[in-house]
Amino acid sequence: MSTILKSLPKGENVGIAFSGGLDTSAALLWMKQKGARVFAYTANLGQPDEADYDEIPRKAMEFGAEKARLVDCRSQLVHEGIAAIQSGAFHVSTGGVAYFNTTPLGRAVTGTMLVSAMKEDGVNIWGDGSTYKGNDIERFYRYGLLTNPDLRIYKPWLDQQFIDELGGRAEMSAFMTAHGFAYKMSSEKAYSTDSNLLGATHEAKDLEHLDSGIRIVNPIMGVPFWRDDCAVAAETVSVRFAEGQPVALNGKTFTDPVALFLEANAIGGRHGLGMSDQIENRIIEAKSRGIYEAPAMALLHIAYERLVTGIHNEDTIEQYRISGMRLGRLLYQGRWFDSQALMLRETAQRWVARAITGEVTLELRRGNDYSILNTQSPNLTYAPERLSMEKVEDAPFTPGDRIGQLTMRNLDITDTRAKLDLYAKSGLLSAGEGSHIPKLESDKG
């Protein structure tokens, strides 16, 4: 039996992820008038551009909802954000600047917590505002069914009758006004914004064109650091971790991770830290472009990775990065709670994060321009005396030890030279003159 309903299930309980915006307001009123019993669920994700969360359920009741609930998702969202930092679950980057998967993390929390709330109310049909071209339709589908295997999906934007009657924002506004709800459309921005406590995503409209960029964006979590009239003073910041958990900023200890994230957002936001422009591959293998903000995630990630490199050995760091890339892609695809993701995540949290205790001091300047000023940890394996260029007592190794180590390298050097000669004879490489190393055919000048 298909879990996706193509038309409105009249007379049944239908839950809708309700934002209070024009789209979901019109959808709720329309579904009510067409005979569904509509239940509205709003996720409090700490969106920086949301002024009054309590007003949203009240609006839903005015539009005809049988019940409207505000679900506080902030603690769970921060928990998942810290887990992503601990496991390096970020696979999209440009020039070394990462996208911190803030929207996928938000969908993982929203998709599970709202459907769980619906299930408590006996609601087993769920609708939301995601479109068929995007990632969210699949993310919500997966998380919804993982949470409630009896769930069925109804999306107004996949219902042809809804599209025919209310196919655009002008039609939705007229529909609301005609039924006594004066709904003035907000002025159209040059792009669309979606946000939560971890970060903001700006995309679509003018930002679909690569000749439009960050300069048309008005940040909601930071400052437009690229503008000459935007004053940004350098600031020294310290971040302390205890067994992989961020616990203090500038010497102030936080027992509430949400409060710590809010402060980290304020600190990083003053500089525009964590803003990036990315071209990424959507789940359906088509490319899209987004401009992102994530000041707290960026600040904590920088400090965390500094401690990782000072504490763990090269092989552990390599595995952390490889696994993090894979985990980031799984998170992006809506598979954050799949077994393969849990395996990668738990491994990093157990064997990498548990050792991360210490404090990193940085100087933040404009955008992603920063310097690391100090790194302290009782677990550092960085020991400068081991490699000091000065004479030290009780040196860990001697010139004679290094001669022996280099002599052992003759084994693989001899084997490598034999392989290069073999490749030259087979035509893969051009033979070098004298003792010159053979070259690839494409390297011959």
Curated annotation (Swiss-Prot):
<feature type="binding site">
    <location>
        <position position="43"/>
    </location>
    <ligand>
        <name>ATP</name>
    </ligand>
</feature>
<keyword id="KW-0067">ATP-binding</keyword>
<dbReference type="InterPro" id="IPR048267">
    <property type="entry name" value="Arginosuc_syn_N"/>
</dbReference>
<dbReference type="GO" id="GO:0004055">
    <property type="term" value="F:argininosuccinate synthase activity"/>
</dbReference>
<feature type="binding site">
    <location>
        <position position="280"/>
    </location>
    <ligand>
        <name>L-citrulline</name>
    </ligand>
</feature>
<keyword id="KW-0055">Arginine biosynthesis</keyword>
<dbReference type="GO" id="GO:0000050">
    <property type="term" value="P:urea cycle"/>
</dbReference>
<dbReference type="GO" id="GO:0005737">
    <property type="term" value="C:cytoplasm"/>
</dbReference>
<feature type="binding site">
    <location>
        <position position="136"/>
    </location>
    <ligand>
        <name>ATP</name>
    </ligand>
</feature>
<dbReference type="GO" id="GO:0042803">
    <property type="term" value="F:protein homodimerization activity"/>
</dbReference>
<dbReference type="InterPro" id="IPR001518">
    <property type="entry name" value="Arginosuc_synth"/>
</dbReference>
<feature type="binding site">
    <location>
        <position position="99"/>
    </location>
    <ligand>
        <name>L-citrulline</name>
    </ligand>
</feature>
<dbReference type="GO" id="GO:0005524">
    <property type="term" value="F:ATP binding"/>
</dbReference>
<dbReference type="InterPro" id="IPR024074">
    <property type="entry name" value="AS_cat/multimer_dom_body"/>
</dbReference>
<keyword id="KW-0436">Ligase</keyword>
<feature type="binding site">
    <location>
        <position position="201"/>
    </location>
    <ligand>
        <name>L-citrulline</name>
    </ligand>
</feature>
<feature type="binding site">
    <location>
        <position position="192"/>
    </location>
    <ligand>
        <name>L-citrulline</name>
    </ligand>
</feature>
<dbReference type="InterPro" id="IPR048268">
    <property type="entry name" value="Arginosuc_syn_C"/>
</dbReference>
<feature type="binding site">
    <location>
        <position position="139"/>
    </location>
    <ligand>
        <name>L-citrulline</name>
    </ligand>
</feature>
<dbReference type="Pfam" id="PF20979">
    <property type="entry name" value="Arginosuc_syn_C"/>
</dbReference>
<dbReference type="Pfam" id="PF00764">
    <property type="entry name" value="Arginosuc_synth"/>
</dbReference>
<dbReference type="GO" id="GO:0006526">
    <property type="term" value="P:L-arginine biosynthetic process"/>
</dbReference>
<feature type="binding site">
    <location>
        <position position="131"/>
    </location>
    <ligand>
        <name>L-aspartate</name>
    </ligand>
</feature>
<feature type="binding site">
    <location>
        <position position="136"/>
    </location>
    <ligand>
        <name>L-aspartate</name>
    </ligand>
</feature>
<dbReference type="GO" id="GO:0000053">
    <property type="term" value="P:argininosuccinate metabolic process"/>
</dbReference>
<keyword id="KW-0963">Cytoplasm</keyword>
<dbReference type="InterPro" id="IPR024073">
    <property type="entry name" value="AS_multimer_C_tail"/>
</dbReference>
<comment type="similarity">
    <text>Belongs to the argininosuccinate synthase family. Type 2 subfamily.</text>
</comment>
<comment type="subunit">
    <text>Homotetramer.</text>
</comment>
<keyword id="KW-0547">Nucleotide-binding</keyword>
<protein>
    <recommendedName>
        <fullName>Argininosuccinate synthase</fullName>
        <ecNumber>6.3.4.5</ecNumber>
    </recommendedName>
</protein>
<dbReference type="InterPro" id="IPR023434">
    <property type="entry name" value="Arginosuc_synth_type_1_subfam"/>
</dbReference>
<dbReference type="InterPro" id="IPR014729">
    <property type="entry name" value="Rossmann-like_a/b/a_fold"/>
</dbReference>
<feature type="binding site">
    <location>
        <position position="129"/>
    </location>
    <ligand>
        <name>ATP</name>
    </ligand>
</feature>
<feature type="binding site">
    <location>
        <position position="131"/>
    </location>
    <ligand>
        <name>ATP</name>
    </ligand>
</feature>
<dbReference type="InterPro" id="IPR023437">
    <property type="entry name" value="Arg_succ_synth_type2_subfam"/>
</dbReference>
<feature type="binding site">
    <location>
        <position position="194"/>
    </location>
    <ligand>
        <name>ATP</name>
    </ligand>
</feature>
<feature type="binding site">
    <location>
        <position position="135"/>
    </location>
    <ligand>
        <name>L-aspartate</name>
    </ligand>
</feature>
<comment type="pathway">
    <text>Amino-acid biosynthesis; L-arginine biosynthesis; L-arginine from L-ornithine and carbamoyl phosphate: step 2/3.</text>
</comment>
<keyword id="KW-0028">Amino-acid biosynthesis</keyword>
<dbReference type="InterPro" id="IPR018223">
    <property type="entry name" value="Arginosuc_synth_CS"/>
</dbReference>
<feature type="binding site">
    <location>
        <position position="203"/>
    </location>
    <ligand>
        <name>L-citrulline</name>
    </ligand>
</feature>
